[in-house]
Amino acid sequence: MSSNLQMKILAKETAIYGMSSIIGKFLNWLLVPLYTYVLQQQSDYGIVTNLYAWTALLLVILTYGMETGFFRFANKEGLHPKTVYGTSLITLFSTSALFAILCAIYSQPIANALGYPTHTEFITLLAIVVAMDAFASIPFAYLRYTKRALPFAALKLLFVFLNIVLNLFFLVICPTIQEWAIIGAWYNASYGVGYVFVANIIATAIQTVCLLPYIIEGFKKSDTREASTLPQTYFSWDILKQMLRYSLPLLVLGVCGIMNQTLDRILLPFFYQGADAQTQLGIYGACFKVAMVMMMFTQAFRYAYEPFVFAKHKDKQSVEAYADAMKYYIIFSYMILLGMIFYLDLLKFIIAPSYWEGLKIVPIVLWAYVFQGVYFNLSFWYKLTDKTQWGAYFSMIGVVITIAIQVLFVPRIGYIASALSGAICYFIIMVLSYLIGRKHLTIPYDLKSIGIYTLITVALLGIYYLLKGCITGWNEYIFMIVGTLLFALYIVLFYRKDLRFLLKRK
């Protein structure tokens, strides 16, 4: 299969998975203005930011690399995909259930340690949510493996829709109708931020129930079209051992990787005193969310790219396809980065004005997402060569960098250092992964074009910030016009250099 055709397949799958991811993330993004405008204090949003940072870390621990392991072994010769699927399901269910039970039993000491001694129910609710999400990662991976993008997208969007509706119900509708007997009997307006977690667990439970048909499918015998000549069992200790040997290094990688993403929101409260800790975290967390468009794009690309890489890694022209994917990922990432920065004066209205003081972190976070996405693209050299320990090494280096920057500089410059820690961390491990990876798997990246687009992006940003710094008589709308012209220039250069040739490919 030619590289051009592979790029079209990747683009199609990215569009399908990306639509659900982008729409879902965007709709969830709309909860940010709801929280910042409706929750009574900035510290309330700080609680949301802090606890969801913890849940993100715990979710990676509870999946312990099995999602990627499933893709690797489901595509492996001599193994029945259904056996791999069943083994993954049973294993994840067992560990997730155990985690939820233990957290419920020890909710009080956990709540004390995290600084929420009067809200042990927050711990129990989120533990159950994390357990269900960890288990659901395998059925969702199975849907991606079997190329069933529509059910995947529908179930992802179902959760988002339910979560938004329930948040609106608890935070907006109920306060206005709590005098009704049917509402007043159970609704407590002072519970406030707690209803964010109640909405989450209800939406997650419904989504998990809807996954049941695909979970049951894993325990059905395959027909002749599904590798029926291979031995199929519901569970295999041998396969589990192989998967764990492959996936456990990915656990270290994943834990360190998610720590690089969430340590800022986990550690930040420890650098401030009293109530100011959650207030500063609330401001930081809200402004961090403004940059989520870049994360949406990276996530959409990941959904399509991971199964694409493992399925195509034996093709002779696969390395050419990987190089093209990297190039166009970077081009479109720069496009999003420029658009977000040039229109930040408009985007800032998605959060309440009391949070605007933190908008200076947005460009830094955008660059961090760009470096993170490039690092993700580079990471397949050690996944395809079964040298996943390198991913763990890079991630551990990243954690050390992240912690060092935050400990040294947050007390001096505040949450700006938290944002910088992510950008610097991903830039360093991105460079390390490229330098070491080319010794193990040769991929002909178009470094010349990537370098040119990087210089163009930096130059356009330099012009924009130079004008903003030197001209004091223009208002924000004039600068948005300037940004529009600069953005259009990038599009024109992209079209003339690459896009018109890409569109002509057959």
Language-model segments: what does each one mean?
Residues 5-67, 95-106, 127-129, 163-164, ...:
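Signature of the first transmembrane helix
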Residues 2, 465-506:
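Membrane-proximal transmembrane or re-entrant/amphipathic helices at the cytosolic face
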Residues 124, 154-221, 396-402, 415-436, ...:
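Hydrophobic alpha-helical transmembrane segments
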Residues 1-10, 180-193, 197, 209-261, ...:
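Interhelical loop/hinge segments that connect adjacent transmembrane helices in multipass membrane
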